[in-house]
């Protein structure tokens, strides 16, 4: 999500902006082992352009995205977790209704933002799987030297 935000802010979503010295254009994405994931992240960035996402909206959406990732072993307090999530959803609603450019269209804007969040679940899952796979591969290739 942060990668899509950086791409939106620094390159108007023309490229994937991992860091100032690591920027992927379409060709670089194709060469990557994670081409499909890059395409997905680029699409999110393009949605940011289409929606003209504000930093405040991005921040609240980022929290909601993080709160949608539940550990495999569950939570210590599901009720507290759900309350926190509900509070951030309320904050997103407030943010959308406050924005003068959204006057009269705040519910449509809220729908677009939550739809974008919902569309990211598969991408987030695939990214986590890719990261875990890459980590496992790096562990398998690790060389242990005798003392």
Curated annotation (Swiss-Prot):
Residues in coiled coil: none
Binding site for 21-hydroxyprogesterone: 6, 134
Domain NR LBD: 1-147
Binding site residues for progesterone: 6, 134
Residues bound to aldosterone: 6, 134
Highest taxon listed in the record's lineage: Eukaryota
Single GO cellular component term: nucleus
SUPFAM superfamilies, alphabetized: Nuclear receptor ligand-binding domain (SSF48508)
Cellular localisation: Cytoplasm; Nucleus
Signal peptide range: none
Gene3D superfamilies for this protein: Retinoid X Receptor
Primary localization class, coarse: cytoplasm
Annotated GO MF terms: DNA binding; steroid binding
Keywords, comma-separated and alphabetical: Cytoplasm, DNA-binding, Lipid-binding, Nucleus, Receptor, Steroid-binding, Transcription, Transcription regulation
Domain remark in the UniProt entry: Composed of three domains: a modulating N-terminal domain, a DNA-binding domain and a C-terminal ligand-binding domain.
Family: Belongs to the nuclear hormone receptor family. NR3 subfamily.
Physiological role: Receptor for both mineralocorticoids (MC) such as aldosterone and glucocorticoids (GC) such as corticosterone or cortisol. Binds to mineralocorticoid response elements (MRE) and transactivates target genes. The effect of MC is to increase ion and water transport and thus raise extracellular fluid volume and blood pressure and lower potassium levels.
Full protein name: Mineralocorticoid receptor
Organism: Gallus gallus (Chicken)
């Amino acid at each position: 999500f942060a990668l899509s935000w950086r791409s939106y802010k620094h390159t108007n979503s023309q490229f994937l902006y991992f860091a100032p010295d690591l920027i992927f254009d379409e060709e670089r994405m194709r060469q990557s082992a994670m081409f499909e994931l890059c395409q997905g992240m680029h699409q999110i960035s393009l949605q940011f352009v289409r929606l003209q996402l504000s930093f405040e909206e991005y921040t609240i959406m980022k929290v909601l995205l993080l709160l949608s990732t539940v550990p495999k072993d569950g939570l210590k307090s599901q009720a507290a977790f759900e309350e926190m999530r509900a509070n951030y959803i309320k904050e997103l609603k407030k943010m959308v209704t406050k924005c003068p450019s959204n006057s009269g269209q705040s519910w449509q804007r809220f729908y677009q933002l939550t739809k974008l969040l919902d569309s990211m679940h598969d991408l987030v899952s695939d990214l986590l799987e890719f990261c875990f796979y890459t980590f496992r591969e790096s562990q398998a290739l690790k060389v242990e030297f005798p003392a």
